[in-house]
UniProtKB/Swiss-Prot annotation:
GO terms for biological process: mismatch repair. This is DNA mismatch repair protein MutS. ATP binds at residues 616-623. It comes from Pectobacterium carotovorum subsp. carotovorum (strain PC1). Coiled coil: none annotated. This protein is involved in the repair of mismatches in DNA. It is possible that it carries out the mismatch recognition step. This protein has a weak ATPase activity. It comes from the Bacteria. It holds the Pfam family MutS_I. One of its GO terms (cellular component) is cytosol. Belongs to the DNA mismatch repair MutS family. InterPro entries: DNA_mismatch_repair_MutS (IPR005748), DNA_mismatch_repair_MutS-lik_N (IPR007695), DNA_mismatch_repair_MutS/MSH (IPR017261), DNA_mismatch_repair_MutS_C (IPR000432), DNA_mismatch_repair_MutS_clamp (IPR007861), DNA_mismatch_repair_MutS_core (IPR007696), DNA_mismatch_repair_MutS_N (IPR016151), DNA_mismatch_repair_MutS_sf (IPR036187).
């Protein structure tokens, strides 16, 4: 395109001049330029769209003496193409014809009516119904980060101020924005460079005074103190840029964005990016959604409920009062869940319908769904009436009634409206007398035409005569070619077909004009009445949004009640005393995919028992046992019941996992480097109220290096940090730690050998494992028998070399290396010597003495 626009602008056709003017306003994004029934793309946009969408690249005539590269998509299928582009992280400007071709001199007037970007979509066809779709902005300076997210399809506006890179990375992973705005001065590009939907913005868009002004204008406030964000200077920079971008792309006001909320780390259990990934909360390690915690817990019946549940899972709360209210509601709802859920299912995705209402893009079927939702409210209230629980009563009051709005929509919109208002037939008969009159005139055509056909056929004696209509020529009287010579002179030929002639007569032409006028008037009036419905509904937007949020929460709680009942979960006790005590704990995901019964296990952590050294064979269940502890704690902190016979959960501020690792090739980091980075994060940030899972630390280096690191990390966690720690290891040397430190206990996962086979008992027992069963597991995995046989021989040789009867005994040299805290006499003597004060004879004597000390 650049080459063409460099030429004299006037050398182009008027239509292309119009195109270039509009394209200049949106140089970075694709421009869908409406021409009749198609959206066309030209020049570089056409080439790019052709590649992305796999559509034909053609040429359209010439402009300025050169052929114009062109690609196009039909207007009726545009949503499908937009959805594909948005999923690729692309943005599109939609340019519509707003002038009347019949009255336009020169090109029809056009303008960009909306900009579709990955983070600002609200159309049902473009959104994934069970996932939040977030627009985000990020700011960074020497004090840390400012981060803002907006879900334009609900109006949810959040800000936070992560203090370091690890916290910022965790926020990006938790929120997973579809589109991310960042300043041109942004330094930590490695944090974001692999994300889709990146948008580089000029620095002035992050100006703090402008941000405050924008936000106060949006919320109708004088300052932001009431939202608790007045002092969040970094976050406000990001929020200001984000809000301006949303307004620029939507080309309309955003009345559903009515406030902003500060998210503070201390309000919830903090999890870093590695922990979220390893616990497979909403996404498994392969990137899918199967066999995740969300997959087990999410049987919600509305999409907005599903999205809320996932937000709860990713932000476990530490507000004990709020969690206990959720527990009480779940207990109360268990008896009525089967009766309540069918009504909730009929409510649908009210949250996103309201966003489209606010943006004035709601379609007729959105209004029909809203009406259907309102019709469920009396039944929902009736179901909840017997429950005398504060949290349930609060939800009932927020849901509201909206009888007047339901009545309005029942009177105004037909039962099953068409997709688009421009198709007509949306407003119900009887709602507006004038509309009914115009429709009667238009709809009376068939009776009139039947009468005209019978009259003319009998009058002229032409048995082939019939009256019809088509979209090109309008109304006509058709006579067969064989009888066409018999028509009277006032029949004016309108169209010739192979076997027939079509005519128009003055009476029919006059009626045609009247019918077409009435259809046009009816459609214009219907559009005006439809717009008026928005004006009648929007004053209630705030209460409607509260109602939708309450219904989503009710759906989540009812769903968790059903899950607790179906999956045999128990209500955990949330205690203010430190520690975790679980009886008969189960892994919520693994127990669902196992064919055989899951072996439940206890867990006890307290200030006197703060670290478990976990040993046992590979495949014995160490990782499952550790993860289930973290998941039970997390579930308790979303208010959910848990898979256990009994659970008492004390204060937990963070959950850390150092479980498994893979190379981070994109960042040039080896498995061991990834492992050590995650370990460093734990050692720097864990507290005595943190739950820490450490699985096989130190595997990626030599035995002595790995053992030394594992020992030192365990020591640090147990003695300095005093965190609640599950420490799984194959280094049997670590099983001596309980002898050296208070609060450290050995447990193991049991297994039994029968000849060449091994049976995993999956039960947690006190004490250290007797052996690792590595060769038995290798045989189970299908390692050739000759290799296993050779390994057994080699094992015996190694055991003999270390003077051990079995591999469970501890290498004395390694224990000396790690466990000997006594200072060496030789080293003490050396430190006391002043070499400059010694004669050669004295130096030689000292050398002999030091030799004896070793």
């Amino acid at each position: 395109m650049k080459d063409s626009t460099d030429k004299d602008f006037t050398a182009h056709t008027p239509m292309m001049q119009q195109y270039f003017r509009l394209k200049a306003e949106h140089p970075e994004i694709l421009l869908f330029y409406r021409m009749g029934d198609f959206y066309e793309l030209f020049y570089d946009d056409a080439k790019r769209a052709s590649q992305l969408l796999d559509i034909s690249l053609t040429k359209r005539g010439a402009s300025a003496g050169e052929p114009i590269p062109m690609a196009g998509v039909p207007h009726h299928a545009v949503e499908n193409y937009l959805a594909r582009l948005v999923q690729m992280g692309e943005s599109v400007a939609i340019c519509e014809q707003i002038g009347d071709p019949a009255t336009s001199k020169g090109p029809v007037e056009r303008k960009v009516v909306r900009i579709v970007t990955p983070g600002t979509i609200s159309d049902e066809a473009l959104l994934q119904e069970k996932q939040d779709n977030l627009l985000a902005a990020i700011w960074q300076d020497s004090r840390g980060f400012g981060y803002a997210t907006l879900d334009i399809s609900s109006g949810r506006f959040r800000v936070s101020e992560p203090t370091d890179r690890e916290t910022m990375a965790a926020e990006l992973q938790r929120t997973n924005p579809a589109e991310l705005l960042y300043p041109e001065s942004f330094e930590s590009m490695d944090l974001i460079e692999n994300r889709h939907g990146l948008r580089r913005r000029p620095l002035w868009e992050f100006e703090p005074d402008t941000a405050r002004q924008q936000l106060n204008l949006q919320f109708g406030t004088r300052d932001l103190t009431g939202f608790g964000v007045e002092q969040a200077k970094l976050a406000l920079r990001a929020a200001g840029c984000l809000l301006q971008y949303a307004k620029d792309t939507q080309r309309t006001s955003l009345p559903h964005i009515r406030g902003i909320t500060m998210e503070r780390q201390q309000d919830g259990i903090i999890m870093d990016a590695a922990t979220r990934r390893n616990l497979e909360l909403t996404q498994n390690l392969s990137g899918g959604v199967e066999n995740t915690l969300a997959a087990v817990l999410d049987c919600t019946v509305t999409a907005m409920g599903s999205r809320m549940l996932k937000r709860w899972i990713h932000m476990p709360s530490r507000d004990i009062d709020a969690l206990q209210q959720r527990q009480q509601a779940i207990s109360a709802l268990q008896d009525i869940t089967p009766d309540l859920q069918p009504y909730l299912r009929q409510v649908g995705d009210l949250e996103r319908i309201l966003a489209r209402l606010a943006l004035r893009t709601a379609r007729p079927r959105d209004l029909a769904r809203m009406r259907h939702a309102f019709q469920q409210f009396p039944d929902i209230r009736e179901q909840l009436a017997p429950l005398d629980i504060d949290s349930v009563r609060r939800l009932v009051s927020l849901i509201g009634q909206f009888d007047e709005l339901r009545d309005l929509l029942e009177r105004a919109v037909i039962e099953a409206p068409p997709v688009l208002v421009r198709d007509g037939g949306v407003i119900a008969p009887g709602y507006n007398a004038e509309l009914d009159e115009w429709r009667a005139l238009a709809d009376g055509a068939s009776d009139y035409l039947d009468r005209l056909e019978i009259r003319e056929r009998e009058k002229l004696g032409l048995d082939t005569l019939k009256v019809g209509f088509n979209g090109v020529h309008g109304y006509y009287i058709q006579v067969s070619r064989g009888q066409s010579h018999l028509v009277p002179i006032h029949y004016v030929r309108r169209q010739t077909l192979k076997n027939a002639e079509r005519y128009i007569i003055p009476e029919l032409k006059e009626y045609e004009d009247k019918v077409l006028t009435s259809k046009g008037k009816a459609l214009a009036l219907e559009k005006a009445l439809y717009d008026e419905l928005f004006d009648l509904l929007l004053p209630h937007l705030a209460e409607l949004q509260q109602s939708a949020a309450a219904l989503a929460e009710l759906d989540v709680l009812t769903n968790l009640a059903e899950r607790a009942d179906t999956l045999n979960y128990v209500c955990p006790t949330l205690s203010d005393k430190p520690g975790i005590k679980i009886t008969g704990g189960r892994h919520p995901v693994v127990e669902q995919v196992l064919r055989e019964p899951f072996i439940s296990n206890p867990l006890s952590l307290s200030p006197q028992r703060r670290m478990l050294i976990i040993t046992g064979p590979n495949m014995g269940g160490k990782s499952t046992y550790m993860r289930q502890a973290a998941l039970i704690v997390l579930m308790a902190h979303i208010g959910c019941f848990v898979p256990a016979d009994q659970a008492v959960i004390g204060p937990v501020d963070r959950i850390f996992t150092r479980v498994g690792a893979a190379d981070d090739l994109a960042s040039g980091r080896s498995t061991f480097m990834v492992e050590m980075t995650e370990t460093a994060n734990i050692l720097h940030n864990a507290t005595e109220n943190s739950l820490v899972l450490m699985d096989e630390i130190g595997r990626g280096t030599s035995t002595y290096d790995g053992l030394s690191l594992a020992w030192a990390c365990a020591e640090n966690l147990a003695n300095r940090i005093k965190a609640m720690t599950l420490f799984a290891t194959h280094y049997f040397e670590l099983t001596t730690l309980p002898e050296k430190m208070e609060g450290v206990v050995n447990v193991h996962l049991d297994a039994r050998e029968h000849g060449d086979t091994i049976a995993f008992m999956h039960s947690v027992q006190d004490g250290a494992a007797s052996k690792s069963y590595g060769l038995a597991v290798a045989a189970l995995a299908g390692v050739p028998k000759e290799v296993i046989k050779r390994a057994r021989q080699k094992l015996k040789e190694l055991e003999m070399l270390s003077n051990n009867a079995s591999s469970s005994h501890i290498d004395g040299a390694q224990l000396a290396l790690l466990g000997n805290d006594e200072p060496s006499p030789a080293i003490e003597a050396l430190e006391a010597i002043d070499p400059d004060a010694l004669t050669p004879r004295q130096a030689l004597d000292w050398l002999y003495q030091l030799k004896k000390m070793l």
